[in-house]
Amino acid sequence: MAIERTLSIIKPDAVAKNVIGQIYSRFENAGLKIVASRMVHLSRADAEKFYAVHAARPFFKDLVEFMISGPVQVQVLEGEGAILKNRDLMGATDPKKAEKGTIRADFADSIDANAVHGSDAPETAAVEVAFFFPEVNVYSR
């Protein structure tokens, strides 16, 4: 497998629960390196731009409202098969359907407040990483 980078967001619900460190431990224990990280409180404009791919979907307005409801922790994860590995760690979008031991099963409350976001493909990962982190702010190690 190739070394990949993927974007991960710890959403407002998980930040409010003070579980950032526990989630970071899961990334690192799975062999993923955190090569960029920052906390940000998204503006409405930034949330709408980031999730523009979902603009026509019925959940778009609620998603934007949720994502601007509090700070988020945004990070770039790097490692072999990072995109799939992160998605496996996250679990199913609906925490009720997520496997026991996944981030969403352990920390999410609902399909809306589902603790984390992760890029779903190499193309989206590249766009999402660039949205939050100019290349000069990502450090391979």
UniProtKB/Swiss-Prot annotation:
It comes from Paraburkholderia phymatum (strain DSM 17167 / CIP 108236 / LMG 21445 / STM815) (Burkholderia phymatum). Its main location: cytoplasm. It comes from the Bacteria. Belongs to the NDK family. This is Nucleoside diphosphate kinase. It is an enzyme of class 2 (transferase). It catalyses: a 2'-deoxyribonucleoside 5'-diphosphate + ATP = a 2'-deoxyribonucleoside 5'-triphosphate + ADP; a ribonucleoside 5'-diphosphate + ATP = a ribonucleoside 5'-triphosphate + ADP. One of its GO terms (cellular component) is cytoplasm. GO terms for molecular function: ATP binding; metal ion binding; nucleoside diphosphate kinase activity. Keywords: ATP-binding, Cytoplasm, Kinase, Magnesium, Metal-binding, Nucleotide metabolism, Nucleotide-binding, Phosphoprotein, Transferase. HAMAP family: NDP_kinase. Homotetramer. InterPro entries: NDK-like_dom, NDK-like_dom_sf, Nucleoside_diP_kinase, Nucleoside_diP_kinase_AS.
